[in-house]
């Protein structure tokens, strides 16, 4: 089945259209079927991003410009289900989608370019991707480059022929990078992946599966990093939107 034939419903939260993937397999089939990969930018949407959209016009324009916005946070999935009771939408965590996409890229021989992360973490990520899924990494660049080196890096990405470009720089830096790089190399699938390389290489622990399944990943992070409290308190505003139906 060609990827053009795989569709996904679109649900709107606070004016933001989100792809409604049923599960990981649906996400992969939507993005990537029979070697025909969609071109565009993937952005994971969680409650924190929903708040940032309201607070920052630049963030809103960056995220609105991305073609593929999907529900990465459990609270966003719950809001979609509340607003659209018939919706068959599931959480597709960005870190899991990236791994699934890399496994698929390995099978298909798709050229991949990795951007971001610390040099040591990036090197370990490349080594593990090649060992685990035989991923065709055509080139990579850690996150430590100067603004004046961006144009040369964009040209490197274009000249590498990469069809998947994953960018681990945190928001909104990674979204700005992807927007600008696409002007030079539009024929690729771009994915912002935050701290995914750190998790993949074991430098940062994710919440255990049981916590994830209960939708308590945020609590696990808070208990392991109390400095996140201020960030988490901001999310109370999102809960207010959810429970008062302002979505």
From Swiss-Prot:
It holds the Pfam family Glyco_tran_WecG. Pathway: Bacterial outer membrane biogenesis; enterobacterial common antigen biosynthesis. GO terms for biological process: enterobacterial common antigen biosynthetic process. GO terms for molecular function: lipopolysaccharide N-acetylmannosaminouronosyltransferase activity. Its EC number is 2.4.1.180. It catalyses: UDP-N-acetyl-alpha-D-mannosaminouronate + N-acetyl-alpha-D-glucosaminyl-di-trans,octa-cis-undecaprenyl diphosphate = beta-D-ManNAcA-(1->4)-alpha-D-GlcNAc-di-trans,octa-cis-undecaprenyl diphosphate + UDP + H(+). Keywords: Glycosyltransferase, Transferase. Belongs to the glycosyltransferase 26 family. Catalyzes the synthesis of Und-PP-GlcNAc-ManNAcA (Lipid II), the second lipid-linked intermediate involved in enterobacterial common antigen (ECA) synthesis. PANTHER family: PTHR34136, UDP-N-ACETYL-D-MANNOSAMINURONIC ACID TRANSFERASE. This is UDP-N-acetyl-D-mannosaminuronic acid transferase. It comes from Cronobacter sakazakii (strain ATCC BAA-894). The gene is wecG.
